[in-house]
């Protein structure tokens, strides 16, 4: 039996849902931060198991969604510089900036390439030593270490044609900004566990405090 099988047992799920309904005596609003949580909650039909008093809200956990139009405009401008190769994740290609998108810039002649990791971008730099290669880095704390590793590798290999345009965001300030705005009254936050394994739980201690 796989460890995850116990979490997908129908009887266990029904028992947990019944316990939640029994304890739910007032309206509660919960926000999940991570886009992976949003996907899993919808995929497994969690909202249908919860009482109407429990309202699940999706937070800013999508790297694409939190990348500003201004940052995209700058990335597009870099890609349009002669000889520059811009590399990034496929999710970013069709995201609009203020005037155009990376896909449209690519169609217009810019050398924009989809990679699956910053290490792939490093390989592009190795293969094109006479051209500047820029990696558009997006995401939160979980994607930053791999980008940092690529930078250290480039330094060790003296790849002076490799640079990173980092648009990484920190998850605790993003959550704090939502709470401070006062527009959404939250009773709890389902925090991003994978982020906490990188930065530690102390960064999120402001929530219970």
Q: In which residue ranges do the predicted regions lie?
A:
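Phosphate/pyrophosphate-binding betaalpha-module
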Residues: 136, 140-203
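Metallocofactor- and cofactor-centric catalytic cores in central/energy metabolism, strongly enriched
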Residues: 1-130, 144, 148, 152, ...
